Amino acid sequence: MVVGIEGIITKKEPTFIIVKCASGLSYGIFISLFCSAKIQTQEKHEFFITQIIKEDSNKFYGFLDKDEQKMFEMLLKVNGVGANTAMAVCSSLDINSFYKALSLGDESVLKKVPGIGPKSAKRIIVELSDTRTKLENVSDDKSEALAALLTLGFKQEKIISVLASAQATGTSELIKEALKKLR
């Protein structure tokens, strides 16, 4: 099983890239639009991989952010949601919008995603509603950074928005990056 790939991006389409590794092997990886916006060709990146093997295919789905990968994998557990639909959700909703829709039971947010109708939106809300507490604990670093920035007087909505797009890892790095964007 492949769980990570690091290499130079040699080809980039909106939701598909080819990564050439140091070993000389190149891998085709499906990515979300959010991930695509953060990368360029000829850059070196490391991707968290979810590998899906079927009798007629072996596909890699790549993520720069472990939280987005967890969201993708949770969506795959929903009855009737496949990899394409899960990736459409990852491309349409940032992780905080997704969590908020789940916690509020807001089907209308999910219905805006291409390929998700009323029945699928309801099924996602129902089947993942009990996992909300797990989702809240996905990134302890982001939670700690949120708490620290709140004590500094910043608005929660702005903080969440900034942290959702943050590249840094670790609480202190997240806070530094957020402070630059919030000022």
Swiss-Prot record:
GO biological process terms on file: DNA recombination; DNA repair
UniProt-annotated location(s): Cytoplasm
Keyword DNA repair appears in the UniProt entry: yes
One Gene Ontology MF term: four-way junction DNA binding
Stored Pfam families: HHH_5 (PF14520), RuvA_C (PF07499), RuvA_N (PF01330)
Region (Domain II): 65-139
GO CC entries: cytoplasm; Holliday junction helicase complex; Holliday junction resolvase complex
Highest taxon of the lineage: Bacteria
Gene3D superfamilies attached to this UniProt entry: 5' to 3' exonuclease, C-terminal subdomain, DNA helicase RuvA subunit, C-terminal domain, Nucleic acid-binding proteins
Region Flexible linker, annotated ranges: 139
SMART domains on file: HhH1 (SM00278)
Keywords for this protein: Cytoplasm, DNA damage, DNA recombination, DNA repair, DNA-binding
Domain I: annotated span: 1-64
Function noted in UniProt: The RuvA-RuvB-RuvC complex processes Holliday junction (HJ) DNA during genetic recombination and DNA repair, while the RuvA-RuvB complex plays an important role in the rescue of blocked DNA replication forks via replication fork reversal (RFR). RuvA specifically binds to HJ cruciform DNA, conferring on it an open structure. The RuvB hexamer acts as an ATP-dependent pump, pulling dsDNA into and through the RuvAB complex. HJ branch migration allows RuvC to scan DNA until it finds its consensus sequence, where it cleaves and resolves the cruciform DNA.
Record note on quaternary structure: Homotetramer. Forms an RuvA(8)-RuvB(12)-Holliday junction (HJ) complex. HJ DNA is sandwiched between 2 RuvA tetramers; dsDNA enters through RuvA and exits via RuvB. An RuvB hexamer assembles on each DNA strand where it exits the tetramer. Each RuvB hexamer is contacted by two RuvA subunits (via domain III) on 2 adjacent RuvB subunits; this complex drives branch migration. In the full resolvosome a probable DNA-RuvA(4)-RuvB(12)-RuvC(2) complex forms which resolves the HJ.
Name of protein: Holliday junction branch migration complex subunit RuvA
Source organism: Campylobacter jejuni subsp. doylei (strain ATCC BAA-1458 / RM4099 / 269.97)
Lineage, highest ranks first: Bacteria, Pseudomonadati, Campylobacterota, Epsilonproteobacteria, Campylobacterales
The encoding gene: ruvA
